[in-house]
Amino acid sequence: MPVMIAELPIARTHVPRDAVLFSATILGGSALLFWLEPMFARLVLPTLGGAPAVWNSALLFYQAALFAGYLWAHMLHRWPLRAQVGAQLMLIALAALTLPVAIASVPASWKALDPVVWLPGLFAASIGLIFIAVAAQASLLQSWYARGGRAPWFLYAASNAGSLGALLFYPLLIEPAVSLSRQAKVWSWAVLPLALFTAVCGLSAVRRRAAVGGGERESAAAPAQPIGAALRLRWAALAAGPSGLLIAITSWLTVDVISAPLFWVVPLAIYLLTFILAFSRSKAFSPDLIAPLLIVAISLITFVRAGAASTMFAIGGLLLLFYVALGIHRRLAADAPEPTRATEYYVWIAGGGMAGGLFAALVAPLLFDWTYEQPILLVACAVLLDPPPLSRSIDAFWHGARALPWRYGLPALGTLLYVTAPRVIDDANLGPAQLGGIVLLAAAALLAVGRNFSFAVHLMLLMAATGGISAVESSLAGNQRARSFFGVYRIYNDPKQGVRLFTNGTTLHGAQSMLRRFALRPTTYYNPMSGIGRMMTAVPTLFGTAARIGVVGLGAGTTACWKRPGQDWTFFEIDPAVVAIARDPSHFTYIAGCAPDMRIIIGDARLRAG
């Protein structure tokens, strides 16, 4: 999600008296904005059972609201200064009428839609106006400060310090110690001093313009250089790639790799840090060598389940996000226009960020039955990164006439070895020929770094060889996967164990024997010797033969086979996709064979059980 950004040629001159005022106001506003983001997402989280996708939907809304705030600031930029100040204060006043922060009441018909569609609407109805008002103030204040020719770029540091500070302090200090209701009240009251400081900044800017003789008219200046459509689209594309990658990596990590409270704050903090480094012109952490290596490495594991290597997968994903986003944001910083065009620059960056988020958080879940957005964005970012060759001498030879047979023969041989070898990537038992083919494809991809089209093609071949073909085959089969707001579900057979498995990422939701005589016998966590198995065996003794039993979570429906005559059972399942899978006898027969009339209530059991 783009933050307030700009070039940072900080002049070592006398600091004007109002610089501290503007810095403090921007810092406070940015801190409030990035306090509101995790706080409201945390407030909404229980309404959808704590699904990790809630944060992706939240990010999508925040990107859209940030775009609206930047667009508002850009529109006001053309107005007289007094009118700008008045309009911004009026917007804050109108937005304050929606406080305190709380979940808005929405039509019941909304919740009949996919959560990925209605959840951003819930965010907009609840905090949309106040978020836009606060998001606009940093851009406006930079514009006000720059009136009369002053360089506003040092205010960028204050904006990012507030954003990153709030984002890091929230999970460490605020969330563990302060209740959500109290947080919402404190945040709502904090808008008042922000409005007062904004008014004082506006008054200071107006007085300064009058003091230097400008009044409400701008001093004569050379016309700004025109900006073409190609450059605007370039800004948007360079912002869209990392923004979409942020959501894709966050989803991958929180669903498939590691599950931890508020873990999604970490990728967002890394994303913000790349903006700070890129626009500060810092030369630290050069991505030229590391980013292509990480792209190739992650391409090798994109279609592979994390399993026991989840920690290494998480570290790799975060490093990938950092170096790739840093490299692309540095290209974006190099394209920064003159200060008079700053608000337009911000609008296109915010618009690109929103487009990337829209694809990763909304379009992809509705369009794909698997997280194909991750490899798509990985290839797109590899092109946007435009890295130099890993070695110019090797690149010159490799793309010369003498290397032509090798240049095409290496990936062709790798592909041939992979195709002719048995594909057992799901079991992580690679045969020598298959492993050799993958090594050749990875080597060819590294040799192609610096040639964007060739690099992208080699990455796609590499991902196809490391599970991409199997993933597409599963999608084309039509009945092996299902995707919903709550995750990507996979139904597949394990011939070695003789069972059919039901998984979501690294989580096993159920298994059923493929042997007819054992098909209705509870397995996995629910077998007779498990804790649940022993408890269910004791139910008639403890609660009688007419016991009323509620089960939270349906999975494959395994526990339905513990139901005994006379008992009254109710299942609570939050995801309709899980209900459809469990009821489909072509997938699992627990419900059809043991309790075909089982009552299933769709929704969060914490809200529906009463």
Show the residue positions of the predicted features.
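Alpha-helical transmembrane segments of multi-pass membrane proteins
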Residues: P2-G610
